[in-house]
């Protein structure tokens, strides 16, 4: 295997380069490095740094006492960046013997042997054995089989990536039900559906360990969902968290959507707007998927670090911060297609909604999506008026 040196942030690592005549996809290599996830890792550095500052502000821990684990490390790039750029101890785990050796080599390259630990174990075994302040689950595919062990291990922040967006978003319905014990719907807001299904799964797994959660930052970018959750121990926090769980109603005929809070609820099957039969998604997370103050802290950390994707990262976090806390978003183009109307600039539509007395904002999910508390009938009337 040929290796090359790459640089992310201030961290250098040696990563394998599959031969040009390889008959397997890059993800099937003995050690997988994905350059497309640099943005994810840049945001991870800033978000982890922001959370560590919160931990240190409580004056219960020293920086050298904070423990972070990357349960699926491959080359070690994610954990090494946390150790070197955030300055806390990082455990990097991978079951692959090739990855285990490469992690140790890359630790030496960065002079981080004293601040890191390489382990070669099943992720679930390691997480059931050890407690960590920050647990990072970034597997290839679904994180579902590892959420229980991660919930048992975590003491401060749980960071989770999911790349199985088809099951999460409803494109592969049965797989989504099997993995997440939730019914997703493949709607125009399927990306938000996937995020809320994942958050709901995390909330339910944490609840089994009498832990609640506060979503600090969540985003859907390219082919993956990523979330950072502050973990709050105790039954009161757990019960408070579960109050943000529920179901989402969707009318495929008129576009109505609305939340129903609670895990044991009666849901009317008829759409309150047009009387058609509705579809039901859930259980899923209906609460905010980010904390505005934390977003500001992450943006500040992004400014302080030399990052290749800084501008893209800041744009994503800013959009997340400024979104309304109203599930689920609307897509202007979908509504315009239904009405046979011409689309205007998204900012023009948002200002028109506000002028009519409604709340409205853009979202980070797409350039044509928006949130509002306006009823679907009012949204359509405003779009019709703007298209003339």
Curated annotation (Swiss-Prot):
The enzyme's E.C. designation: 2.1.1.216
Q: What name appears for this protein in its UniProt entry?
A: tRNA (guanine(26)-N(2))-dimethyltransferase
Give the protein's biological function: Dimethylates a single guanine residue at position 26 of a number of tRNAs using S-adenosyl-L-methionine as donor of the methyl groups.
Name the residues that bind S-adenosyl-L-methionine: 41, 78, 94, 123
Q: Does the keyword tRNA processing apply?
A: yes
Supply the source organism for this entry. Answer: Methanosarcina barkeri (strain Fusaro / DSM 804)
The enzyme class is transferase
Extract the InterPro entries matched here. Answer: SAM-dependent_MTases_sf, Trm1, TRM1_arc_bac, tRNA_met_Trm1_C
Q: Which UniProt keywords apply?
A: Metal-binding, Methyltransferase, RNA-binding, S-adenosyl-L-methionine, Transferase, tRNA processing, tRNA-binding, Zinc
One Pfam annotation reads TRM
Q: Where is the Trm1 methyltransferase domain?
A: 4-383
Family under the similarity heading: Belongs to the class I-like SAM-binding methyltransferase superfamily. Trm1 family.
Q: Which GO terms describe its molecular function?
A: tRNA (guanine(26)-N2)-dimethyltransferase activity; tRNA binding
Under NCBIfam families, the record lists:
TRM1
